[in-house]
Structures are given as structure tokens and as C-alpha cells.
Amino acid sequence: MKKIFIMSIITMLSSLFPCQAQNKGYKSLSADDYEKAIADTAVIRLDVRTAEEFANGHIRGAINIDVLKSDFEQKATATLPKSKTIAVNCRSGKRSKNAAAILTKIGYQVIELDSGFNGWQAAGKEIYRDGKKILILDGKAQPKIIREDKLNDLIIK
């Protein structure tokens, strides 16, 4: 009798959370898996942060369309071919999930960086600014970002 009661409770509780099994239509990837996915040149890299955030550093080859702007969907459809996979990132992963949902709804195949640009940095992945690779110390944004070609100037001889 006790087993039946417990099983009833478990069944009832599991029915309260159907969204856990719901397909969101896009894939959320770790920084390592995202890096592998965007190595494919057919994948379009989309950074959905603000223009200011993007200018401070971004993933190589990314284009910037701010998801918080009212014309995001219009700019996305005018810029992004539906025949390509779109790899979306933002700062922490929240805006990229929102953008991924919007893009998926209008017919795009989408992957998104689950941990966002912060996770990308923490994983020690390459970051670019003004077309040049930059180095961020300790995997975190520093007040002063040092370009890789300037590191020798910092070495005490």
C-alpha cells in the first residue's frame, strides 16, 4: 500500500513538469562544443549583445545584431540565410537563448553558447577586437586588455 502511494505521488509530481521534456528547437552547447561547431565555415556566428559589448571583444568572425532592439527579427532575416546554421552567443547565455528561440520560430537552425561570452572567456577561448586577437588574463576581463603581440613588453628581463 505504501509503495502504491509513493508511486502515485511520483507520477503526480512528474506530470507537473512537462516542460522538462519539451523540445526547445535549438541546441545549447558548452564552450568546447560550441568552438567545435563554429569551426565549420558554413556556420554563421551571431553575437546578440549590444554594439558596445561587441566592440569590447567578441568571437572571431561574429556579426552583431542586438537582440534587445525592436528590429532584431527584421535585421536577422535580412542578414542571415536560412540555409545556414546560426551559432548565437551573448554575455551570459540569457539573451542568446531568447534570440535562439526567436530564430528557431522563424525557421532557422540554431545552436547557442550556453554559458555565453563570459563562459567562453573563462574557458580560455580566443577573443577578437578590431579584427585582432586579444588576450584576457586569467580567463577574465581585465581593466586593460593586452594584445598577444605586446606580451613581450611585459616580461621582466
Segments from the language model and where they lie:
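Bacterial N-terminal signal peptides
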Residues: M7-S15
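Short, surface-exposed ligand- or partner-binding patches at beta-edge/loop junctions that are enriched
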Residues: N89
